[in-house]
A protein has these predicted regions:
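Transmembrane beta-strand segments of Gram-negative outer membrane beta-barrel proteins
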Residues: 59-76, 96, 100
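Residues on the lipid-exposed face of transmembrane beta-strands in outer-membrane beta-barrel proteins
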Residues: 70-72, 92-96, 125-129, 143, ...
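Residues that define the transmembrane beta-barrel architecture of outer-membrane proteins
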Residues: 64, 86-90, 117-123, 155-161, ...
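Outer-membrane beta-barrel transmembrane domain signature
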Residues: 179-284, 297-300
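Cleavable N-terminal export/targeting peptides
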Residues: 1-60, 299-303
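Outer-membrane beta-barrel translocator domains and adjoining extracellular loop/strand segments
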Residues: 78-85, 115-121, 150-158, 187-191, ...
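Outer-membrane beta-barrel "beta-signal"
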Residues: 39, 284-303
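Short loop/turn motifs that connect adjacent beta-strands in outer-membrane beta-barrel proteins
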Residues: 57-64, 130-138, 168-173, 199-211, ...
Length: 303
């Protein structure tokens, strides 16, 4: 098979979706109507399960709010792999959550050096619930539609399910999320994320926390290589692909978050440990700095 730009674009775009889905992933937990549990719920919603929104809720708060966020990453790596292009990325997101479990969000991603720079917009709908005696278990079901800036149509939909558990003190937790990504083609991914939670400082209207975390990305992916062949005296690049379902990347994060009233900030260092798959070899570790800012709009009716 001769070189096909769409074949190359397909692989790159799947990596981009894997990156995006991790960067905007979330989990939700307690839904009891008291301050402590509301705080716990919001504590888990956004920024890759690492953002903390504390000490901003009044009594009798109802789960009905809009959350806006803007994330900046100093460099871009797809499944931990260096694409050879140094570029930052920016991810804006607006999400809505209701106490019934319904949630919706719209998001997108901007790359510094891609053309077009605005890669795609995603619209997601979901439903989450907690279960278990202590409400320490949760599940979330969701659907996402992707709208690309170009004519890419390999992966335009995603069906997602996630399961989570954490201890009663909320100092340890883990989630497991699975996605079926499809369009004119299809792929699968599994993402596991585990965290520890340390409160460094806390007052009536301010909180600072450190939560190191580790995530594993397993996905179905076609890896290809190009070889030169001579046909009738002419040179051709011939593509051959190998499909694998394997661990693609391990990421370790060290974020510190600051929250005051309805505002929250997060600053973290992230290390990627990409795992060679198929014919890959000698993959270098990569790292970047992440920064995010968010604001919560309370649209609840107070008693």
């Amino acid at each position: 098979m001769l070189i096909s730009f769409r074949t190359i674009n397909k692989k790159i775009s799947l990596f981009r979706l894997l990156f995006f889905s991790i960067a905007t992933s979330f989990c939700s937990y307690a839904q009891e109507k008291n301050d402590e549990n509301v705080d716990s719920l919001i504590d888990e919603l956004f920024f890759n399960d690492q953002q903390f929104l504390d000490e901003m809720l009044e009594k009798n708060y109802i789960y009905n709010f809009i959350y806006t966020s803007l994330s900046y990453n100093s460099n871009t790596f797809f499944s931990g792999r260096d694409s050879g292009i140094d570029q930052f990325n920016i991810i804006p997101q607006i999400s809505y959550y209701h106490s019934s479990g319904f949630n919706a969000s719209i998001s997108g991603i901007y790359y510094e050096n891609f053309t077009p720079s605005w890669d795609f917009t995603s619209v997601s709908l979901g439903y989450f619930k907690t279960f278990g005696k202590s409400k320490n278990f949760m599940y979330n079901l969701g659907y996402t539609k992707y709208f690309y800036s170009d004519d890419f149509d390999y992966f335009t939909n995603s069906l997602d399910i996630s399961l989570g558990i954490r201890n009663k003190k909320q100092t340890l937790g883990t989630t497991l999320a699975a996605s079926y990504i499809f369009g004119t083609d299809e792929s699968y991914q599994i993402v596991s994320n585990s965290f520890m939670n340390f409160t460094l400082s806390r007052t009536a209207n301010f909180a600072m926390r450190f939560r190191p975390n580790i995530s594993f990305v397993i996905a179905n992916q076609t890896f290809g290589k190009y070889t030169i062949r001579i046909i009738n005296g002419r040179r051709f690049f011939v593509y051959s692909g190998t499909e694998v379902f394997d661990l693609l990347n391990t990421q370790i994060g060290f974020p510190i978050s600051f929250s005051r009233e309805s505002w929250d900030l997060e600053l973290g260092y992230y290390l990627n440990l990409p795992n060679p798959a198929a014919d890959e070899n000698n993959l270098s570790n990569t790292s970047f700095i992440g920064f995010s800012v968010g604001y919560l709009f309370d649209v609840s009716k107070k008693k």
